[in-house]
Structures are given as C-alpha cells and as structure tokens.
Swiss-Prot record:
<dbReference type="InterPro" id="IPR015421">
    <property type="entry name" value="PyrdxlP-dep_Trfase_major"/>
</dbReference>
<dbReference type="GO" id="GO:0019264">
    <property type="term" value="P:glycine biosynthetic process from serine"/>
</dbReference>
<dbReference type="InterPro" id="IPR019798">
    <property type="entry name" value="Ser_HO-MeTrfase_PLP_BS"/>
</dbReference>
<dbReference type="InterPro" id="IPR015422">
    <property type="entry name" value="PyrdxlP-dep_Trfase_small"/>
</dbReference>
<keyword id="KW-0808">Transferase</keyword>
<dbReference type="Pfam" id="PF00464">
    <property type="entry name" value="SHMT"/>
</dbReference>
<protein>
    <recommendedName>
        <fullName>Serine hydroxymethyltransferase</fullName>
        <ecNumber>2.1.2.1</ecNumber>
    </recommendedName>
</protein>
<feature type="binding site">
    <location>
        <begin position="125"/>
        <end position="127"/>
    </location>
    <ligand>
        <name>(6S)-5,6,7,8-tetrahydrofolate</name>
    </ligand>
</feature>
<comment type="similarity">
    <text>Belongs to the SHMT family.</text>
</comment>
<keyword id="KW-0663">Pyridoxal phosphate</keyword>
<keyword id="KW-0554">One-carbon metabolism</keyword>
<comment type="subunit">
    <text>Homodimer.</text>
</comment>
<comment type="pathway">
    <text>Amino-acid biosynthesis; glycine biosynthesis; glycine from L-serine: step 1/1.</text>
</comment>
<dbReference type="GO" id="GO:0004372">
    <property type="term" value="F:glycine hydroxymethyltransferase activity"/>
</dbReference>
<dbReference type="GO" id="GO:0030170">
    <property type="term" value="F:pyridoxal phosphate binding"/>
</dbReference>
<comment type="pathway">
    <text>One-carbon metabolism; tetrahydrofolate interconversion.</text>
</comment>
<feature type="modified residue" description="N6-(pyridoxal phosphate)lysine">
    <location>
        <position position="229"/>
    </location>
</feature>
Length: 419
C-alpha cells in the first residue's frame, strides 16, 4: 500500500508505539553502553531521506545503474571528508557495518585458512577478531594474544606468537580495553614476520578523529572502523588505508562486488554529514570531555572498592571486574537497568562464567557526554552505580537511584522534552 500522506502513526500503531517508547527510554535512561551514542538531527534526517530509493552499485563515476549523478556527489563528499578527517590516502564508505568492514579487509588481505593474530575476546577483543563462533574464526586460523598482569596489552606475547605462527595479518584493536594501543610496536611485530598490519578503531574512531587518541591510519596497512560509537554517526562501517594502489584495488573489489551489492546511499550521506560534524572545533571539546568523564567515573569506582581492569582508563570506556564481589555481570546489568541505568555485562580477564552471564561490566561515556554530562554528573552517576552494586538486592536503593537518574536525565534532554 503506497499512500504518500499516510504516517506510521496512523498506519501502524503497534510499530509507532514501540518507537515512541524507545524514544522515551532514550530520554529517561542513562546510557552507559560504550558502543552507543546519540546521533544529531542531521544524521537522523539523512537516514530517512529519498536517497534510500536509489540503487548505485559500483563507485562514483563507475556505476552499473543510471541516474546516479547526485548520489555520486554524496558518496564523494563522504570519501573526501573521511580521508581528510582521518588523514588517510584511501577511504571506502560503503561497508554496511564494522563487522562487514572487517570481513572485507580480511578478504583483501588473506585467503581462507590463513592465520590471523588478534586480541582474545575475553581480554577485550571482538567477535570478528577470530572468535570461533564468528566467520573470522571459521574461515581463518585465529591465534590470540591478551593482557599481561598489569592490564596492558602483552606485546611480548604477541611478538612470540607472531614468530611461532607467522600470521598473514596481525590485528590491533578492541571492544573492551581501556588503555592506549602502541600501534608502532605492532607495526614492528608485523614487519618482523612480513605480515600485514591491520587496525580496528571502531571504539575510538571519534577520539582519533579529534586528535585525543593516537591514530594508526598512517602506520597500519588497513584500518577499519564503525561510524557510530565515539564518532557519533550512523550505524555503519568504514575502511581506511595509507597509499597502496594495489591494496586499494583489492579493498574496493572485496567490498563490491566481493561481499556487497548496492550501497546504502542514505546511510552514506549520513556518514558524510557526521564526518563534517567531527571536523568542527566543538567535536574536539566533546572528545576531550568523553575522556574526562570516563576517568571521573573510573576513579570513583576504584575509591569505592571496585576493580578496574588495567587500573583505570585512557579512553572512553573501562571494564569493572566483579570476580571478587560474588556478583555476575548479568545480575549487575539487570539491577542497574531497573534503576534506568543501561550498561552491558562483559567478560573479563580470568573469566569463570559463560559469555551470557560474565563477571564484569563495560561502562562508557560517549552518550552521557553528548547529553552534556561533565565530571560532576559522571562522578555522581558512578556513586549511584556503586550504591546499587554494594547492595544489589535492595530494591529501595534501586528505586531511589532510579528517581535520581530520571531527574538528572530531565536536566539534559537528548532531543527534546517528551510527554
């Protein structure tokens, strides 16, 4: 049924209700999931634009369909801005997600059965870094390094494993590591075994773009990322690289036609405007505040007796180990959720529970910083988290924190006040 004037509200009240409720949840809950953020109204607008109607297989100026002259402009803007923002020589803005960007980079760099050396999932890596349940662990032989006793990346272990297994690709990147990666050291390890060096900066891309976290783009052969999280764009992927014409051709072919068909032009346009937003001076201030808020929260939780993996944070997130608290990550996530504080359970080094239960929490500050929280609010919030974890079955404490969280959110609306 095509009716240009019919709204979702009037046509599909069930779906409209779910979206309305989700918007209320986002307004009234404190978002501490490290991979989530709030996009700008401009990004929202473009994701619902008429560009969603256009098929555009191929690349700007080399399409398989006619009528692409205007989407070519949008995609070229996204490419040029990505290259400028990240100081890259090459950018492919077509990947639909970070996982697909990784798959496409692997396709360009490896053959099935080749060896991938990456960070262990339980130490802060990602499913697509060679987990046995992921395509990356099924199609490639994955070997993993982890963290040392000090909570830092064990570079010596990585170097030893590289010499032992001679991987085709060495990957540096993470989904739950709160330190700073020594990209150059990984470059040297990769060079020692003639491996490609690939980085996944999905979590810190916004921090890298703002210059508050070291960039690997001109150190690595290939860099992948998502465009949401700290970058605050649409949920999608991006591949970057330093100059290498042969590798650029392989990357383009791996994306299209290797693993994708028609690109999502409305999402690519949203990427373009998000990249422009990240070029503004205000974005650097935002990224700096993300770090300040994360440090403030981690310090409070340490003072309250909670173990922070790696001892603290130098980016937007930190891991709380509950191994010594007789609390599971699942229990903690649920209790905090009842108080309108959204976090995610996470595996931690020395994990004894299943990935569906875990012994830790991952906490991140990109979303609360977008709302306008500063150190005062971040510290206050950390105390509330500790209040609940200190007495996790005390529903009175949970109700009290819920009321405080609701009031705090009211002072910092995401988009606008709701009924």
């Amino acid at each position: 049924m095509y009716e240009p004037t019919l709204t979702v509200e009037s046509f599909d009240s069930e779906l409209a209700g779910a979206i309305r409720d989700e918007r209320r949840r986002q307004e009234h809950h404190v978002e501490l999931i490290a991979s989530e953020n709030y996009v700008s109204p401009r990004v929202l607008e473009l994701q619902g634009s008429v560009l969603t109607n256009k098929y555009a297989e191929g690349y700007p100026g080399r399409r398989y369909y006619g009528g692409c002259e205007f989407v070519d402009i949008a995609e070229q803007l996204a490419i040029d801005r990505a290259k400028e923002l990240f100081v890259a020589d090459y950018a492919n803005v077509q990947p639909h997600s970070g996982s697909q960007a990784n798959a496409e980079a692997y396709m360009a760099l490896m053959n099935p059965g080749d060896t991938l050396l990456a960070m262990d999932l339980s130490h802060g890596g990602h499913l697509t870094h060679g987990s046995p349940v992921s395509f990356s662990g099924k199609f490639y032989k994955a070997v993993h390094y982890g963290l040392n006793a000090h909570g830092d990346i064990d570079y010596e272990q990585a170097a030893q494993l590289a010499q032992e297994h001679k991987p085709k690709v060495i990957l540096a990147g993470f989904s739950a590591f709160s330190g700073i990666v020594d990209w150059q050291r990984f470059r040297e390890i990769a060079d020692s075994v003639n491996a490609y060096f690939m980085t996944d900066i999905a979590h810190v891309a916004g921090l890298v773009a703002a210059g508050v976290y070291p960039s690997p783009v001109q150190i690595a052969d290939v860099t992948t990322t998502t465009t949401h999280k700290t970058l605050r764009g649409p949920r999608a992927g991006l591949i970057l690289a330093k100059a290498n014409p042969e590798l650029e051709k392989r990357l383009n072919s791996a994306v299209f036609p290797g693993s994708q068909g028609g690109p999502l032009m409305h999402i690519i346009a949203a990427k373009a405007v998000a990249f422009k937003e990240a070029m503004q001076p205000e974005f650097k201030t935002y990224a700096q505040q993300i770090l300040k808020n994360a440090k403030a929260m981690a310090e409070v939780m340490k003072e309250r007796g909670y173990t922070i993996v790696s001892g603290g944070t130098q980016n937007h997130l930190f891991l709380v180990s509950l191994l010594d608290k007789n609390i599971s990550g699942k229990e903690a996530e649920a209790a905090l959720g009842r108080a309108n504080i959204t976090v995610n359970k996470n595996t931690v080094p020395g994990e004894t529970r299943s990935p569906f239960v875990t012994s830790g929490l991952r906490i991140g500050t990109p979303a609360i910083t977008t709302r306008g929280f500063k150190e005062k609010e971040a510290s206050q919030l950390a105390h509330w988290v500790c209040d609940i974890l200190d007495d996790i079955h005390n529903e009175k404490v949970i109700a009290d924190v819920k009321q405080k969280a609701h009031e705090l959110c009211g002072k910092f609306p995401v988009y606008q006040e709701l009924d």
